[in-house]
């Protein structure tokens, strides 16, 4: 009995109960599809969404868990991981809502698509809480391989096949580099796999050989992370994959996959590389500069909506990295807050783009000319999301950027913040260009696509979930601007109550900062 109790205490399996619900949901989707076939196909999205919402509910109830460590230290269900896991699960909910009609129209299996998407969700959720090298890599591969499959899911579309091949080849190389970095950590720490134990062993790495090995490990690990978050110069896959992949997949990659990447970045860098904080701050400063400049400048010249949003996501990653480089409570909290609102405004934009694509079959920005005259509600929804991404007040994106810039300014990153402000203004131009094209064009200047714009039919199978997704993301984007302070307090609480971050801040001499919202006028 004592042995069983000891094993149960060490496993602490309750920490992965939200992921367990997702696993059960995944199995139910496959079993129900196998038994019911096409008769139950339309019920599967609702089954998956119900399971994901239950998982999010369990994440909420596990906030500030007394003992968040599970599976003998491999899983850390602290508040920081809870909020990132919730972001990933919610991004999957919206992705399912927007994908029902899209997948059905292509004639492919909806159940298989949902199953692969849930597998990617599991990988992202486990990655966000991974506290051990083996779990970090296995979770990353679960997310990556599922993403490759979703990217090439439209087998009859040559662009989807090309995107999947590019993503697979570059992603496999990135994973190999990342794994080599992890193997160096394992060797330098004397065979430890838990991040905390690795940090304890490496804190005294004072020999030349150990320091050089740790520097090489840092470079390789950052290369793997930078690929996942689409940071320049590891962004080459992003525009082509975004343009060729199914749009719902692009939406998930831009939010869920990116959130998982930033979650593992914080956990790995702050813990395992806590002894060389200055070094990785320098590297991420360079990545942030390159991402903000290239992402926002190249987006100006794009003619494809998905390709424009691909470069936009690269620029957005650069903004988030300012919070990471700040290395303070406010910096980490601003990262979490920005990912929370980015979830809704970016997925809202993709939901509107999917609706436009379903009606017209076009992805070209020029084809949006005059959309207001045929579909004012879609124009309003897409405009709100794009303006929020650009950081126009009083929308949510404005508060997200101002919190990140303020955190960077407090940490002395004056040049980085000023560059962020300049590139943010540049981004406003290409967002407003689309809005102006939709709204300002005279009726006689409408594109041929808009002139032949079909009437909407919400009674078609799969259209109602898309409608719910659009309305939900628009409402959330609008309310997030009004409720910015409570959301930021939530993000701050996730940082303040996370032992890993507090330990790192004490070691680097950072004093807990006052919440940004209190300093703003």
Curated annotation (Swiss-Prot):
Annotated keywords: Membrane, NAD, NADP, Plastoquinone, Quinone, Thylakoid, Translocase, Transmembrane, Transmembrane helix, Transport
Molecular functions (GO terms): NADH dehydrogenase (ubiquinone) activity; quinone binding
Keyword Cell division in record: no
GO biological process, one term: ATP synthesis coupled electron transport
Membrane topology, record value: Multi-pass membrane protein
Function text: NDH-1 shuttles electrons from an unknown electron donor, via FMN and iron-sulfur (Fe-S) centers, to quinones in the respiratory and/or the photosynthetic chain. The immediate electron acceptor for the enzyme in this species is believed to be plastoquinone. Couples the redox reaction to proton translocation, and thus conserves the redox energy in a proton gradient. Cyanobacterial NDH-1 also plays a role in inorganic carbon-concentration.
Similarity comment: Belongs to the complex I subunit 2 family.
Protein name: NAD(P)H-quinone oxidoreductase subunit 2
Source organism: Synechocystis sp. (strain ATCC 27184 / PCC 6803 / Kazusa)
